Amino acid sequence: SPSKAKTLNKYLGKDYEVLASYGHVRNLLSKSQGINTENFKMRYELIDRNKKHIDAIIKAVKKSDEILLATDPDREGEAIAWHLAEILNEKNLIKNKSIRRVVFQEITKSAIIEAIQNPRDIAIPLVYAQQSRQALDYLIGFNLSPLLWKKIRYGLSAGRVQSPALRLIVEREIEIEKFDSKEYW
């Protein structure tokens, strides 16, 4: 976020240029083009509203020797770091440059310095976890909901979390309705 970038710039000084990615930088292609269901290969496109931020990052990377990706320390942040690295790699901007991941749990000067002194590679298992979540959302929710609109009623929705949760609620309600209360002494 821009406010985090500003704080990091303050802590790190003029030897570093900190830029915000403004969250996710790429999305799956729209409609049925985002995931090939034969091999589950995912296809991405740059999010339009983030193009200017990516352009600023590209400009800064051209002047730098080292790239540190400091996105959030969760699977979504890891995926954002991976997407940034992929974009830079596609533009041949990381050849002969170090690109590393820095992770911190708090925005304090000591935590930031500690993270920069101990960079790591992008955690691909976390990236895969985020991609799996995104693929399931796409394949189940984005595709099943329109089918429900056509076959049952417009406005209905389905999703990877919502559908099983709804089933649990319905099953519990059926148990409650079937319950036969009896007095015991």
Located regions from the model:
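Intrinsically disordered, low-complexity regulatory segments
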Residues: 2-134, 148
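C-terminal or mid-to-C-terminal helical accessory/interaction module adjacent to the motor/catalytic core
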Residues: 62, 107-185
